[in-house]
Amino acid sequence: MKLIIALAALIVVINAASDQELWADFKKTHARTYKSLREEKLRFNIFQDTLRQIAEHNVKYENGESTYYLAINKFSDITDEEFRDMLMKNEASRPNLEGLEVADLTVGAAPESIDWRSKGVVLPVRNQGECGSCWALSTAAAIESQSAIKSGSKVPLSPQQLVDCSTSYGNHGCNGGFAVNGFEYVKDNGLESDADYPYSGKEDKCKANDKSRSVVELTGYKKVTASETSLKEAVGTIGPISAVVFGKPMKSYGGGIFDDSSCLGDNLHHGVNVVGYGIENGQKYWIIKNTWGADWGESGYIRLIRDTDHSCGVEKMASYPILA
C-alpha cells in the first residue's frame, strides 16, 4: 500500500515538473511577464487547466474519435471567458446587408477543391495582437488577393489605415468592425500599402490625408448568398472571400479538420478569409486564413468542417471587393 502511495506521489511530482517545464517554455516563446507572483500563479493554474483540456481531447484524436487536435499556443494562459471577451470586443453594429448587391454565381462552375495559396495569391498570415482588428485584416487580405489575381500585384495593404480612418463608416478601430464597411471606406478613399502605413496593433489618429498614396482602388463589393453552396461557388470562381465566424471554440486548435458541434453561427464576431476548400478522407472542409499569427493552428490557418450545421457560421456574412 505504501509503495502504491509512493508511486502515485512520484507521478504527481513528474507531472508537475513537466507542467513547470512547459510553462517555462511557454513564457519564453510568447515573451510573457506578469505584474506579480500572484498573477503568475493564477496564469500558471489556467495554463495547467488548458494542458488538461488539450490532453483529454487529444486522446480522442489519437483514438480516431476526433478529426482535429489541440495544442499549446499564445492563448493558453487565459480562460475561455477571457478569450470570449477578447473576441467580443466587436462594438460595431452588424451592417445591414439587405440592399447590398448579390454575387452572380453559376452553380456547378466551381472546382471540387481549390487552394488559392497554391496559386500564389494569398499573402502571409498576420497577427492582430490585442487589437480587435480582425475585420481590418480580413478586409485588407481580400483586396490583396483580388489584386494579385487581377494584376499579379502582391503588395501588402494597410489594415492600420482601416483601423484608424474608417470609424465614420461604421467600424470601431480596435473595438471591432466588418469587412463590408471596410470595403466601402476603400471604395471612397483608396488604401495605402502596409509599408507606407504600417500596422501598430492599436488605434491612432488617421494619417491617410493624401489619396494619391493609395495603391489600390475599388469600384464596389458584393455579398455572397448565405449558404455554403454559394460560398463554395464564390471561393472557387472569384477568389478568397471575407467572412465572419464564431471563433470562441477555436482557441486551442492545433491542426486537423475542426469539427465542433458547439460552433454554431448564432454569434458571429471574428473576421477571417476563406481561401479554399477540399475533401480529406471523405470529409469536406474550408481553408480559413486566420488573424492570430502563423504560430497558431496550421501555420495560421484552420481547416473547418464544411456542409454541416456547425461550420461556425462561415457562410452567413461573406463578401468580396471589386477592384477598379
UniProtKB/Swiss-Prot annotation:
The keyword Hydrolase applies. GO terms for biological process: digestion; proteolysis. Keywords: Digestion, Disulfide bond, Hydrolase, Protease, Signal, Thiol protease, Zymogen. Expressed in larval carcasses and gut, and adult gut. GO terms for molecular function: cysteine-type peptidase activity. The active site is at C134, H270, N290. PROSITE patterns: THIOL_PROTEASE_ASN (PS00640), THIOL_PROTEASE_CYS (PS00139), THIOL_PROTEASE_HIS (PS00639). Coiled coil: none annotated. Belongs to the peptidase C1 family. PANTHER family: CYSTEINE PROTEASE FAMILY C1-RELATED. This is Cathepsin L-like proteinase. It comes from Phaedon cochleariae (Mustard beetle).
